[in-house]
């Protein structure tokens, strides 16, 4: 029932012009800010601590971030309207050569990104630009929501692999075939994550981008989509990362993850209204850290070979 309702809502949303969609999102975002006090207070508290700003400043930015989130949700439902002919009306890209040159090396590309801007449109925009895009995504607690998201992504030609499942084997094959594999690397990584600094605090961080890059010799290209003042979107592509190679694979993995986290932090600092500040990003305390397996063990998992 939820699946049918959401897909019906998507069809209704797709009847609207994009400008009307953004206007509705603005109203819904303000309502969300006023009504959902738990997430609002968590976002304000985390922003004050992370950015070192006053409560009034944080309230202003968080309100704008809730508007951005509401617009994001509507734009996700709007994805069936996007196609190769019209996407350039909504999405621009800078420095695509960082991606095309990296793809030309033949080892696939790991895209490092986060829940910034309308992140679902990032993969869609790259597909319409002619790039072979796949991504790893965390399944939603409600499987019907996951199915809705995956079906909307499929309308734009984006292939999704579920995190924490056997589909990671298919993700590995995608890199072997020279495709792009995207990672949202700004969530809590649990006890098995790398504990690195994020906004001045130790945070468990997913190591997937570093692990897959190391295993398949794939360049890591930080890529983000940012909402612009006119309501459009810019895919912002940074140069490929210089990864560590000290001869200590475990240490290199942690250092690479730390560098990736710093890049995401810098983008958030530059665009604080476009991140999900109510995420439980610092949910796993450092004392829950588990012993990391050697990188080669993780590489075996990526290949489906468990010791």
Residue ranges and their predicted role:
Residues 38, 93, 117, 143-144, ...:
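Residue-level recognition of alpha-helix initiation/capping sites
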Residues 1-113, 155:
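Membrane-anchoring hydrophobic helices of lipid-metabolizing enzymes
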Residues 68, 105-165, 171, 191-196:
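Catalytic core of membrane glycerolipid acyltransferases/transacylases, capturing the structured
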Residues 35, 90-91, 114, 141, ...:
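Residues that cap or flank secondary-structure elements
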Residues 86-91, 138, 157-163, 199-200, ...:
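Short, flexible loop segments at the rims of nucleotide/cofactor-binding pockets, characterized by
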Residues 28, 50-63, 101-103, 128, ...:
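Non-catalytic C-terminal accessory region of glycerolipid acyltransferases
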Residues 8, 20, 43-46, 122, ...:
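Hydrophobic alpha-helical segments typical of transmembrane helices
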